């Protein structure tokens, strides 16, 4: 029996985005959210890099043991998808797959610059819209996505 997490549906991913909205998002919020992600990743001994951007500025970055420079490249590629589409990188990739194609085949975007793989989630502020992205890289894409969502659920629920 497989213990791999089941991939969420497009509807489930869209519901996460509707739910996980901030009232505001400050530099201090980025630090607190990033620190929570580090704590969750350390509990799991996850070899990840974590990044939070807002309005083109990096507000938080951490590279945990076992992560590599490639994780930073993946972070940039996933974040660009969020910035371009205004949706989670995993949701964007899932929408392409639901249409019987892939992001790489059909987006017409450079795969060296964009990756619609799980792990980058929009920072959305109520009444404003998407202002940034929180991104994790180092695990399989479903797990990267789930780690970010878990942190957002805990943080926004506080």
UniProtKB/Swiss-Prot annotation:
<dbReference type="Pfam" id="PF03928">
    <property type="entry name" value="HbpS-like"/>
</dbReference>
<dbReference type="InterPro" id="IPR038084">
    <property type="entry name" value="PduO/GlcC-like_sf"/>
</dbReference>
<protein>
    <recommendedName>
        <fullName>UPF0303 protein SCO2848</fullName>
    </recommendedName>
</protein>
<comment type="similarity">
    <text>Belongs to the UPF0303 family.</text>
</comment>
<dbReference type="InterPro" id="IPR010371">
    <property type="entry name" value="YBR137W-like"/>
</dbReference>
<dbReference type="InterPro" id="IPR005624">
    <property type="entry name" value="PduO/GlcC-like"/>
</dbReference>
